[in-house]
Amino acid sequence: MAFRVGLPIAVFLAVILAPNPDGLTDQGQRALAVMAMAVVLWATETLHMAVTGMVSIVALTLINAVDDVSVALYGFSQPVTYFLVGILTLGMAVHRSGLAERMAAHLIRFAGGNPKLLYVQMLAAFAGLTFALPSASTRGAIMVHVYEQVMEHWGVEKTAPLNKAIMMAMGGLNRLGSTALLAGGITPVVASALIADFGGIDAFSWTRWFILMAVPFYLVLIFGGLVVYLMFRSGFTLPPGAGTVDLKTGPIQTKEIKAGLIALGTALLWFTDFAHGLSPAVPALIAMTIILLPGVGLLTWREFETNMGWANFFVIASSLSLANALIISGAAAWFADTLVGSVEGLRGHPTLILLAMSGAAAMVRAVMPNISGYLAFIIPVAMSTGSALGLNPVVCGLAVVVVGDSVVYYPASATASVFIYQRAEIRAPEVVRMGIFMTVIAVGVLFTIVLPYWSMVGESLTP
């Protein structure tokens, strides 16, 4: 414990007390010291990730790494932060109404007694259920119990290959369906805000994000699903006597109808943003307001404030504040210039530059399990470096999101995964092996399919 506490303090002091390098302002050095401390805290998980965020905000203010406290609290003033609160509230309402579990049960019924069809439908549900239930953690919490019922009915042991395949996919691939949607939870929310800020572009609309990210993440989901199937293919034959599962759901209730109508109306507003021009945060906040209205909605204020998961709010706001401090202090530009000098020989070879960037992103992800910390660190660096070397910074930002969010290297590295791996008794070496496979898949898909596709939709690698 002493090491985990002492290391971030030592890193902070080492950066802030070092001689000021050429081109880096005093304020930039202080901002870099706070970011370095936050990165180590996120990587070691010495503090809860939300507490790390708040420590960083306080540190930015106390050591004058920003001009004033309003700059330190930049992330708390951004619409994207409240967009996240809105979609989490919508997900909570759908979950508590019972609608999400009913949808999952109906999907499983279609598989009958065929484990291969069950597996394929589960992969499809990772994408389909995201429209009603954005949080991968909540989806996993619902689906794991439903699929455990199926395994129990079929007489499949926890350590059997079929159960491991189902749970490995649920732990390692489930969240890929979320990131394809702007409303898919903390990863797309943080990533889209950072890329828009650093790219100097308008905030991503729901449809623009879907156009750019659905192809890479759905392809990674498909290929990742194939890898899991091949790893455990011996289990996709049912024991003798196993048959169709009949999951009881009961009659549909009024609260489920309400949840479905609210989710459908919100989705329609997101789908039609090209017509009305509303920020994605507005439909999310409308849904949140309806859900909390007495007599009309689905949640009381007490239920909302108790179950919202406020850590997500503080993590995203503090991540945006840290990234903004790096920008306005000049630290991000200095860091990028330093990296440019080390890869100057690759100038004129944009594909090789992005390949090196992707490899570096995978290594950063391996030592930084917290996705918000990873994004807050890697997106500013990747976009600034790419821009300095003549690459499209938006593509660089999107690329490191694809690489970083496609992998899980440790059982405890993602909230959506840890409890699933534990229940299925999946060992750490199996997760590491899957993480390596997913890294290769993500990079391969990115360079063979996604880059040409992005160029077709207006985001080429070189501007």
Residue locations for each model-derived region?
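Interfacial loop-to-helix junctions that mark the boundaries of transmembrane helices
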Residues: 22-30, 41-46, 69-79, 203-215, ...
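Transmembrane alpha-helix interface/packing and boundary motifs in multi-pass membrane proteins
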Residues: 40-48, 125-135, 171-182, 269-275, ...
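Juxtamembrane helix-boundary/capping and inter-helix hinge elements in multi-pass membrane proteins
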Residues: 63-66, 96-100, 109-113, 150-164, ...
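Hydrophobic alpha-helical transmembrane segments in multi-pass integral membrane proteins
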Residues: 266-269, 318-337, 390, 394, ...
